[in-house]
Amino acid sequence: GLFDIIKKVASVVGLASP
């Protein structure tokens, strides 16, 4: 769902900017 995409993006951003 859309929320899953948001979580995935948030995870990528979190890894990129810890």
UniProtKB/Swiss-Prot annotation:
This is Citropin-1.2.4. One of its GO terms (biological process) is defense response. Keywords: Amphibian defense peptide, Secreted. Expressed by the dorsal and submental skin glands. It is found in: Secreted. It holds the Pfam family Antimicrobial20. It comes from the Eukaryota. InterPro entries: Aurein_antimicrobial_peptide. One of its GO terms (cellular component) is extracellular region. Its main location: secreted. It comes from Ranoidea citropa (Australian Blue Mountains tree frog).
